[in-house]
Amino acid sequence: MSNVIFFNSYKLKKGVSVPDFLLAVEKLSNEYISQQKGYISFNLLVDGETWADFTTFKTMDDAKRFAESSEPNKLAEKFYSFINLNSCKTHYFSVERSY
């Protein structure tokens, strides 16, 4: 079974502090995402005004369980406070090959 990438792209709200956003991402990654079942890695990307992140999980079930989690989470709430939610796009990818 191949690993799965949970990929998200989005834009930040106008006027937010990028350093504050980066701190929120770091805390979310270190204190919550990395603790999830099947977690392998987390990456944050940027191209101009478009940001993206991808989290690698061991299985599709692990990725979907994480994505569909509805437990209250102050770290996620802080992260989403920086995001223009109308710009969000999400996709799951199965890793076909790694070189």
Predicted regions and their residues:
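Residue-level signal for secondary-structure boundary sites
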Residues: 16, 61-63, 98
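Short beta-strand
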Residues: 42-46
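An amphipathic, aromatic/His-enriched active-site/gating alpha helix that lines ligand/cofactor pockets
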Residues: 27-28, 34-40, 56-91
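Short acidic/glycine-enriched loop/turn segments that link adjacent beta-strands
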Residues: 47-51
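Short, low-order "capping/linker" segments at domain edges
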Residues: 92-99
